[in-house]
Amino acid sequence: MGVYNKPPLTYTEQVELLISRGLLVSDKKRAERHLSNISYYRLSAYMRPYKQIANGVILDDFIPGSTWDMVYNLYVFDRKLRLLVFDAIERLEVAIRTQIIYQLSHKYGSHWQDDKNIFNSPKTITLRDGRKVVKDVYVDIQRHIKEQLNNNKAEEFIQHYCRKYDSPENPPSWMSVEVMYFNHLSRICTELKNRSDKTEIAEYFSLPPDIFCSWLHTINYVRNICAHHARLWNRGLDITPKVLKFSRVRVWISKPDTVKRSRIYYFLCMLNYLLQTINPTSTFKQRLKALLEKYSEIVSTDAMGFPHDWVNEKIWE
């Protein structure tokens, strides 16, 4: 273990450092302006594909011919990809929330979220550092509802309920669940005690319940990546979705077992599949193909997990 003692550099010094390492910068002032808006550290993730490698180690020096425009354009591509993905997730989130509320309220009543008996019992899990924590979806969603009830900036429909009713204490599910985060939606589906409850929600999206819950977990993970403006395009996904072997009702990829589910391509296929249900006229795939075409000279689809013949898949036609 060493001691970190690198001093902060001015934008001019940062540009000169990159030039000294072999990066071609045709317009230094433009590069400085980019660094002042984006930061060296954030952009460094987009420099890695252009760095030299020796014995499996990424070096400081750039591959000859690498330019500032390549780095910056890769950053821009990733930003546009995140926006495209986030837009699709937003549409899915609304539909998933709607189905959870609809299916469970018709089965268990308007306040099903207040019935702990429909959820699995609390679980104790051990973290990497050895600490033990209790995971209880019922307690967590009740805590969130109470926070909303006590928030003077809560949605108007929550405030209206509090002004007009004193029983039940919590608003009905179509209000309470409307203000929950995607993480809550994912956990609600996963922790429903009866498999039939999960099945009724998942069937709307043409998925088996175990696949649906797994995909929700991954969608929540990628949603957070997008929300925090983190690198997405060639990231290895830490939360890997389960494989959907085939679908009788929707167009799906022909050989799902051969696709790397830890890469973004499989996730993009997931989004496209789900969008077939909630928005059959979605232009998601057209916009994705246009984005990849525009940046084809700098983006490695291999690094994203795309098969070489992906454009021939029916799901992308």
What are the roles of these predicted feature ranges?
Residues 2-317:
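Long, contiguous internal "core" modules enriched in hydrophobic/ aromatic residues
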